[in-house]
Every structure is written in structure tokens, then in C-alpha cells.
């Protein structure tokens, strides 16, 4: 009989390193932006939403053969959920950085730029680690 190992899950949030993973639920669909709802605990009663909101965080889940699946995102919502004994419970919502583009209502006109240049400029406002792997040549567009 195979050994039964519980799934290992971990929360990594540099903005609040004292947060420990407790539970998670999420929604992930093809061609849609994911949303993870994470409950975490900490001995620190004063984790500030200002310190955490908009900052990167990740959850790792141990899957088959000890491999890990990582969910990387930004903290889109954060709040205290209550007290459990002497630990404080917090709720976080993680979303991909691309979600930030849905929060903007900015209108811009790009003249004499290629489509990849436009994408780099728009994405560059939100993600410093965006990498373009396009190889072709793209003509600038008038409007």
C-alpha cells in the first residue's frame, strides 16, 4: 500500500512573510484570468493592507511525484478575517498581473508604432518582467 502523504501547500508573500497558508479556493478557466482566494494565519495582528495590496504573492501546491505547481499573482484584495486562538486570520485574493489592465479606463492613441511596440508599452506599465518572444518583422501602423 502506498504511503498517504497530505498535499503540501505554501504561501509566499514577501510583503508579509509571517503569513502562513491555511486554505485556498479558486477559479481557473481556459482563456480567463484566474482568481485565488487564500486564507492565511499569522501571529502579527498589524499586517497592513497598504503593505500587501498590489504586491506579488504565490501559492505552491505539491502535486504528483513531489513536483510543485505555482500560482503567481498580485494581491488584489486583503483583509483581516478574525482571530483563531492567538493567531490572526487574513483573507487574500490573488489575481494575475494582467488583471490590472481590466482596472484601467485609460484611452490612448498610438501613432506610427507596430502592434508589438504597443503591447510592450501597455504591458510595461504593469509588468516589468514581461518578455516578448516575437521573431517577425512588424510594420508601424498609422493609427
Predicted regions and their residues:
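Juxtamembrane "anchor/assembly" segments of surface/extracellular structural proteins
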Residues: 1-56, 60-70, 78-80, 88-101, ...
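N-terminal export/assembly leaders
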Residues: 35, 120-143
Amino acid at each position: 500500500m502506498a504511503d498517504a502523504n497530505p498535499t503540501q501547500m505554501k504561501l509566499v508573500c514577501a510583503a508579509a512573510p509571517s503569513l502562513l497558508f491555511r486554505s485556498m479556493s479558486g477559479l481557473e478557466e481556459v482563456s480567463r484570468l484566474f482568481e485565488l482566494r487564500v486564507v492565511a494565519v499569522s501571529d502579527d495582528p498589524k499586517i497592513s493592507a497598504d503593505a500587501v495590496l498590489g504586491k506579488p504573492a504565490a501559492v505552491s501546491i505539491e502535486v504528483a511525484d513531489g513536483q510543485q505547481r505555482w500560482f503567481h499573482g498580485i494581491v488584489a484584495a486583503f483583509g483581516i478575517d478574525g482571530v483563531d486562538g492567538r493567531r490572526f486570520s487574513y483573507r487574500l485574493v490573488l489575481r494575475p498581473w494582467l488583471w490590472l489592465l481590466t482596472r484601467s479606463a485609460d484611452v490612448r492613441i498610438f501613432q506610427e508604432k507596430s502592434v508589438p511596440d504597443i503591447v510592450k508599452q501597455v504591458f510595461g506599465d504593469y509588468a516589468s518582467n514581461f518578455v516578448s518572444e516575437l521573431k517577425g518583422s512588424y510594420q508601424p501602423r498609422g493609427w
